[in-house]
Amino acid sequence: VVPYNDDGPAVGCQEISFKTVASWVNSPDAFKITIDTRNLNTSSSASNQFRLNLNKGFPDNLIYDFSVDWGDNQYNNNVTNDITHTYLIPGIYTISIIGNYPAHYNADTYRDNFKLLSIDQWGTQQWRSMKNAFYYCENMVYNATDIPNLSQVTSMQNIFHRAFKFNGNINNWDVSNVTDMTGVFFQASLFNQPLDNWNVSKVTEMDGMFYATPFNQPLTSWDVSNVNKMQDLFNNARVFNQPLNNWNVSNVTD
């Protein structure tokens, strides 16, 4: 900025340069979710709070450094640890996250899992893990239309475990580097979407993947030759009735 007045350039004033940073709320780069703080569970945060739990423990040891807009004109920058936000008014808010946020994580059954209402946008995050990402998120629906970057993801263990309302079209996901699909749709009681485009050739574990789901889509295109664990793969999946006679299960031991 060059100082200036009615007589021309100001003399003896300091020139200051700055840049304007646009809000990331409407950015296609942001990871966006919608929550309802009033959906309480045992050991959840208060009815006017929401907590982001970070997957920093062994064995993933992920590093975070992100900015979060909480949807109430409040935000935090350079977040590196678990964080809880308190809203003035309990209710529904859309949270936008940008920066180094390698994994969304629901540590166990009794946190803020029930507060998540929807996945709205994946953004351009480089995801590193999907383990327990939406575990026990029983009220969550899928509204995202973009595709997550899963090129560095090896574990999708329990990603939609007991996500009762989830029925998203995720057939275009690149899961070619995933090795662990244990419990991916375990008791996801609405899920019945095509998955025939998935490349599962590196997967070694599929225990309980479709346990108690209404899934009934063709899987003849799957290369399961590296899978060694299939225990309860279709257990209690009562409507599943698709041919699997071309599957190579020679490496399955469990």
Task: Show the residue positions of the predicted features.
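Beta-strand-rich extracellular modules
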Residues: 2-6, 98-100
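Extracellular fibronectin type III
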Residues: 4-23
